[in-house]
């Protein structure tokens, strides 16, 4: 059981945004999408989440064509945190997080409450539970939305392969909370068997927390593999136009440290 994309191509008007992109997201693994601005990362995530239809190629989730599944069924298999979640209603934080239970009508109120408290705790926002969402800072709202998708993933029946897609989930966060979010996503993959796809700009954080990396440039895959295979000086020069030294991390065995120069 996997989330698999094969030879995806996407056009916007007369411009091709993605060209024959393939990837596999496995339950229990964390895959990082890297690339310069405009490389096609968010477009690829939109295709994988069912939001955007590719002009060619196909996507399967747990062996079934994604396009054959109703949106309600898709919501039981994957949760998506967009780059800029929009919410203009004056809801309480618990109400926002509780939206993660919407695909699971069979849950009892007690189950929903327990899952909500767990997600608030995992996202480190239990102290915000009594606040109104619109009163929060941008970073606090981002972490509350992270709690929502955590709840959606964990509300699924035990043993069902499921996936979490995160589009720049740490963009508005300070360093401590960036690490907290990525650690939580990593733990969710390891402990709950969720397949996690995350778009991150920081190559060092991606090397630390992701099992695999997929590097995009101008809508095409440059490299796909373990961090040590992907984060090479040649690949970084091609994708970002910078020189870089790639060294063994001095404190994290088996992890790379990338120094841009």
Curated annotation (Swiss-Prot):
Signal peptide: none annotated. Its main location: membrane. The keyword Cell membrane applies. Its EC number is 7.6.2.-. It comes from the Bacteria. It is found in: Cell inner membrane. Residues 3-243 form the ABC transporter domain. CDD domains: ABC_Iron-Siderophores_B12_Hemin. The keyword Chloroplast does not apply. SMART domains: AAA. Keywords: ATP-binding, Cell inner membrane, Cell membrane, Membrane, Nucleotide-binding, Translocase, Transport. It holds the Pfam family ABC_tran. It is an enzyme of class 7 (translocase). It is a peripheral membrane protein. ATP binds at residues 35-42. SUPFAM superfamilies: P-loop containing nucleoside triphosphate hydrolases. The complex is composed of two ATP-binding proteins (HmuV), two transmembrane proteins (HmuU) and a solute-binding protein (HmuT). PANTHER family: HEMIN IMPORT ATP-BINDING PROTEIN HMUV. NCBIfam families: PRK13548.1 (NF010068). Belongs to the ABC transporter superfamily. Heme (hemin) importer (TC 3.A.1.14.5) family. Part of the ABC transporter complex HmuTUV involved in hemin import. Responsible for energy coupling to the transport system. This is Hemin import ATP-binding protein HmuV. The lineage of its organism: Bacteria, Pseudomonadati, Pseudomonadota, Betaproteobacteria, Burkholderiales. The gene is hmuV.
């Amino acid at each position: 059981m996997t989330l698999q994309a094969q030879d995806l191509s996407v056009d916007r008007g007369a411009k091709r945004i993605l060209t024959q992109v393939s990837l596999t997201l496995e339950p229990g693994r964390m895959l990082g999408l890297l690339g310069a601005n405009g490389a096609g990362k968010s477009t690829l995530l939109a295709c994988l989440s069912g939001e955007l239809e590719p002009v060619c190629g196909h996507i399967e989730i747990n062996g079934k064509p994604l396009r054959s599944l109703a949106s309600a069924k898709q919501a039981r298999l994957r949760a998506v945190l967009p780059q800029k979640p929009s919410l203009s209603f004056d809801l309480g934080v618990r109400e926002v997080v509780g939206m993660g239970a919407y695909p699971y009508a069979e849950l009892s109120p007690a189950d929903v409450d327990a899952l909500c408290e767990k997600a608030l705790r995992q996202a480190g926002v239990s102290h915000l539970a009594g606040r109104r969402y619109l009163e929060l800072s941008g970073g606090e709202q981002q972490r509350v939305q992270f709690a929502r998708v955590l709840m959606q993933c964990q509300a699924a029946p035990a043993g069902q392969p499921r996936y979490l897609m995160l589009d720049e989930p740490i963009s508005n966060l300070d360093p401590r909370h960036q690490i907290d979010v990525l650690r939580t996503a990593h733990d969710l993959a390891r402990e709950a068997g969720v397949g996690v796809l995350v778009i991150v700009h920081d190559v060092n954080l991606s090397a630390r927390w992701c099992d695999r990396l997929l590097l995009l440039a101008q809508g095409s895959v440059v490299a796909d593999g373990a961090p040590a295979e992907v984060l090479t000086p040649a690949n970084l020069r091609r994708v970002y136009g910078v020189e870089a030294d790639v060294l063994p991390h001095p404190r994290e065995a088996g992890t790379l440290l990338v120094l841009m120069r």
